[in-house]
Amino acid sequence: MRIHAFAALLLTLPAAAQGAPAPNLLQEQAQRFQPIPSSGGIVAAQEARAAAVGAAVLRRGGNAVDAAVASAFALAVTLPQAGNLGGGGFLVLWLPRSGRISTCPAAARAASPPESIAIGRGEAVALNFRETAPQAAGPDLFLNPDGSVNRERALRSPMSTAVPGSVAGLLQVQERYGCLPLATVMAPAIALAEQGFPVGAELSASLAAAAPLLKADPTSARQFFKADGRPYRPGELLRQPQLAASLRCIAREGAGCFYRGRVAQALVRLMRQRGGLITAADLAAYRAPWMTPLSAPFRGHRVLTMPPPSGGGATLLQLLQVLEPLDLEATGLNSAATLHPMVEAMNLAYRDRNRLLGDPAQVVMPLERLLSGSYAAQQRQRISADRHRPAAELEAEPSRLSEGTNTTHLSVADRDGGLVALTTTLNTAYGTGSSVPGAGFLLNNEMDDFTAKPGAPNAYGLRQGQQNAIAPGRRPLSSMTPTLVFRGDGTPLLATGSPGGSRIITTVLQVLLNRLVHGLNLASAVAEPRIHSQLWPDQISIEQGLSPDTLRLLQQRGHRVLLTPAMGSANSVEVLPEGRGSLGVADPRRLGAAAVVELPWP
């Protein structure tokens, strides 16, 4: 069968829904948003060209893994504020054991990782390619002599850069589960960097806003601005020849180029010149471990998500278990009676996240207890039906368990129902702002995700504990939450995730609640207004779109309400039952996001 790919920005189009029952006004209004259908595979990503790259790889006979890796490398070119070679991330995947494309001779050349688990007619596994602290890093790295945290050093200095994991992770998953040669998968990203692409309105505005940060570094200034120092305007061509050379080297030599070869040498040279901590030994020692996904039932479905050092997956499952018995359908979508217990559960869950979670390779965590039904019941009992419990009140309680902006997410479904949820990050937008001379990629500032000082907020306002202290080789706690959902019979339903720092977890939570509890279609589930609360600061961040009455009722319960700009970018895909194709949604909150579909040729 001949197939072709076409790209289309996800538009929030009104749906007539003729003859369809409308259970209530809110749900009827929400269903105006419709996902993009595909009779084949689909890719939803934060940038349209990168999504189109993934769809083109599906057309070439690639599976969901091939498409996800191709899109991720393309994002390193077209979305430099978040896509990267110099950062890290997580992914969760599921592939069927048999099918037209999801399995192939290339993918069968190695045994399944022992960490994989059987789900339905396939297997699922997670990959941890989070950055690691250099061996020279210690717990006092970002402290001033008076004990205060040096925020500039934690966010912008070479010491804020952790050992990157993106290249190792993407190559490892493609080698194990992909069907196409690496050179084929990486070719589109190389072409985008070498030949250039027209800058869109979002990237043009982003680069202009980041000009003070990027122009402080000579290499970044040359890479992202014109010769006269002006930012690129929409429609102007941005070429990145140094990045193209690095991508070409990786495609030819594999991970060795980045961790031991030409790129490694350039990175270590920069570290020595500027007082950074990463050494050649740190790079050569980097590994991306396979992990068993966290799993829990929810409303007749099974949710699979990322284990620590993602703090997102465990926090998400804890929230789902606390909220599952509540009759949220009866209280209604986005009502104060629904949002209040959600906020209180968020605060309790973030309290546990910040105190208890860390890198499982170095700290002991009470995960089994944290995710148990009995603990969820205890947490529910602590939620008052009509009163907000202030953060200071919760923080003063002893723990019931013992301690032991910019990111990007893409989701892919292939024709066999194979799913990949992949999230990568530099931490804040453009990371440190510094690029590696001769290599063309930005450095992350992930060391700020560690606890610089217990109780001191990081860039996202999270007050974390000793479990997440800086230590050599340790991976910082993250909020990235790539997530898959399966129907009760084990067939795949959807893949989702989001950027957004500490707001990632609550974004994914609300997409799942909107889809699985309130019955919205995937586009409506993604488009609905979002809320966020994380214990500190003691407030609810709320997007525009909730009714004034809802805000007033929340305030009457004791909540401090803060209207905030759009949160997250939950690019998601859904697999239709019985091989009927897939659906894709690019979050309308981010200009330039796209769902790109694969269809049979007419």
Please report, for each region that a protein language model flagged, where it lies by residue.
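Bacterial N-terminal signal peptides
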Residues: 4-15
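Noncatalytic scaffold domains of N-terminal-nucleophile
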Residues: 18-52, 56, 64-253, 258-260, ...
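Internal maturation/activation junctions in enzymes
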Residues: 21, 325-426, 435-439, 454-455, ...
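Active-site rim segments in enzyme catalytic domains, especially the processed small/beta chain
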Residues: 78-81, 90-99, 117, 123-126, ...
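Short beta-strand scaffold segments in enzyme catalytic cores
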Residues: 83-95, 115, 408-412, 482-484, ...
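Short, small/polar residue-rich loop motifs at catalytic or cofactor-binding pockets
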Residues: 290, 404-407, 429, 478-480
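Extended C-terminal subregions enriched in glycine
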Residues: 474, 508-509, 517-565
